Amino acid sequence: MKQLIHEEKTQTTCVLRLFGAPLWTVQQAAQQADIAARCRGRGAEVLAALQAETPAGLEKARKALNGRFAAELYGEGETTLVHAAVQALETHRRLLVCCDADAGTLLEARLETVPGAEKVFDFGALSYADAKTREKLSARTCRVKGGPIPAKLARVQAAQRFVGADLAAGCVERAEDTVLFLGSRRGCWVRTVANTDAPALWLLDMIRRAASGLPQAAGTSWQKYGRAVPADVLTVQTLPDKPENTAPAKPPRKRHRVRNALIFLLVLALAAVAAAWYYTGGDLTALPQRLQSLGADSLPHAGAKLI
């Protein structure tokens, strides 16, 4: 124990784990806070390796990123997302069930590796794997019209109520994507994820955030029971892309140069008019004759010698 405390007090490096934050936002936040960080992204997960000269500097960097990414930051070091989800359920005393075997397949293989997961997840014993509960769920959803999405939303609500769980998970697997559902007493979070984008991890992150009372990631929508799910929610949701550079374009600068040149020429013209007015005594019509007389005076007279 003393050794661990000593290591914490002298630690100058650490690795923070985030899920649901675009890589570019983490890099930008570290740069703005003057934090020495190497960031690496894989899918929706980002690992940020922090380094500081002193333990106090490292703690300051930790707090800065935690303040910026409170919902996305789920752990440090070797902590995995599934461990973070189980810890959130345990800490806040939330019970999780699945309304169907598809959602159970996404979660069970990962949760069974975490000690104590059976305290917060039923592994189907009280829900979809129980014959009586499964019969009740089927009876509830067979009357729902509109296709698999409204039926799944009703099944999630029924599973949460019949079992008395705090959270109920479900999913609709399609050819190229999976629609994830996580229901509570008041409503349901819905997110559509590409099958290549690890739907199981997204569902675990939704569970972690919901259990902890944290806001869901961008693209995850809140849906009330009994209402139609909007079509845009049923399309694949991705994290925000980095905005393009908003530096001034070159054409406006060219227009500024042309305007300045015109102003300069106008000033020269006004100066010429003023000089002509002074030279002719206000009679500008005599200007051509005056100019001719100047030209005649400059010509050599007859008999003059050129030196």
Question: Which residues are covered by each model-predicted region?
Answer:
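Short alpha-helical segments enriched in small residues
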Residues: 2-8, 19, 23-31, 56-240
